[in-house]
A protein has these predicted regions:
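Short conserved beta-strand segments at catalytic cores or DNA/RNA-binding microdomains
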Residues: 1-12, 24
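Structural motif
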Residues: 16-24
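Short alpha-helix plus adjacent loop in nuclease-associated cores
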Residues: 66-87
């Protein structure tokens, strides 16, 4: 079919050398030179492929993958606190019931039930979630600080600003993350150190990897409807006929 939003290529594997050779053989330099922007996740191999094949294009790290790295670090803090609490409970006198808070839950329950709430904006919280998080933040301020920075990062990505302005705001945000001094943010710090230019490229045109992620979802649904894939070549053939 061709046109906007269609599948251009389906290549097995993630080995950069193999994929680079396939793409360069399929497209001449004049075609590849026309590509101005490539969005991808934080995979080093995907970034290498994009920069080697489409040498004239800006490589952009998908903002949602960047936010996911930070959100995972926040969740690791929650898990660590809960793990310590469970260890303390195991060493405590079992005849004494655990403390319940004003919402009727124990801290162990509050921590377990806050996972998804900590990924949401405050304006989307229900009253039950709001009460739960109020207690959580009161007794574990590190989670409040981490959550506040998660929302600040989201606001930066949502802002209609230039890459230069974004760099200034990101630098201040990064300093705040460093100031928390929590080991769970090592992956976040490493990500921003290694990928700062490609993360900031998002603010050129605000392109995301959403279309590719949506296509992945379609493939998974299609695969489940077929109850799995026995003949891979025929499955790829059908995908090409449907989406190419």
């Amino acid at each position: 079919h061709g046109g906007k939003g269609t599948l251009a290529a389906a290549i097995p594997g993630t080995k950069s050398d193999e994929i680079i050779s396939i793409l360069t053989a399929a497209m001449g330099k004049s075609v590849r030179r026309k590509v101005k922007e490539v969005t991808c996740d934080l995979s080093p191999s995907m970034m290498l492929i994009a920069s080697e094949v489409f040498y004239n294009a800006h490589v952009v790290n998908d903002r949602f993958h960047v936010q996911q790295v930070y959100n995972e670090a926040v969740d690791e803090i929650r898990i660590d606190i809960r793990r310590r609490l469970i260890a303390e409970e195991n060493n405590r006198d079992k005849s004494v019931p655990p403390k319940t808070y004003s919402n009727g839950e124990t801290m162990r329950q509050i921590l377990a039930r806050s996972k998804h709430t900590l990924m949401m904006s405050q304006n989307k919280w229900s009253e039950i979630q709001r009460h739960r998080v109020y207690i959580l933040f009161k007794y574990h301020p590190i989670l409040k600080s981490a959550y506040t920075l998660a929302m600040e990062l989201r606001r930066i990505f949502n802002a209609q600003i230039s890459p230069t302005k974004a760099m200034s705001r990101m630098s201040k945000w990064y300093e705040k993350v460093m100031a928390l001094g929590n080991n769970n943010f090592r992956s976040v710090i490493k990500t921003f150190k290694n990928h700062a230019p490609t993360i900031l490229n998002y603010f050129r045109r605000r392109a995301t990897n959403a279309s590719a992620e949506a296509f992945n979802s379609k493939v998974k649904i299609f695969r489940s409807q077929m109850r799995g894939v026995r003949d891979r070549d025929f499955f790829i053939f059908r995908l090409v006929k449907l989406y190419a």
